[in-house]
Amino acid sequence: MARKSLIQREKKRKKLEQKYHLIRRSLKQEIHKVSLLSEKREIYVKLQSLPRNSAPTRLRRRCFMTGRPRANYRDFELSGHILREMVETCLLPGAMRSSW
């Protein structure tokens, strides 16, 4: 189980990313439209003035049950060992262990 503070920090980053998503996207589109270097620099300054935690690269996928940051399956939003436990106890419909 991840520390509660790390999980809360990740939730805060997700909120910030959603809040500034449209602004960040519009600034990046402007950069591609503008051809003058001086105008591009102004737009880059605006982009850099946004909060650092609002960048999508700062987000980390976490297991929604345990908060574990590694070995996550995107389809289920679960870490590997929780996914395995849920499949073994038949809590995930349609998921089966492979055998050949």
Swiss-Prot record:
Name of a matching Pfam family: Ribosomal_S14
PROSITE patterns per UniProt: RIBOSOMAL_S14
Keywords from the named record: Plastid, Ribonucleoprotein, Ribosomal protein, RNA-binding, rRNA-binding
Cellular compartments annotated: Plastid
UniProt superkingdom: Eukaryota
Entry's Gene Ontology molecular function annotations: rRNA binding; structural constituent of ribosome
Chief place of localization: plastid
Record-stated family: Belongs to the universal ribosomal protein uS14 family.
Name of the protein described by the UniProt record: Small ribosomal subunit protein uS14c
Organism: Cuscuta gronovii (Common dodder)
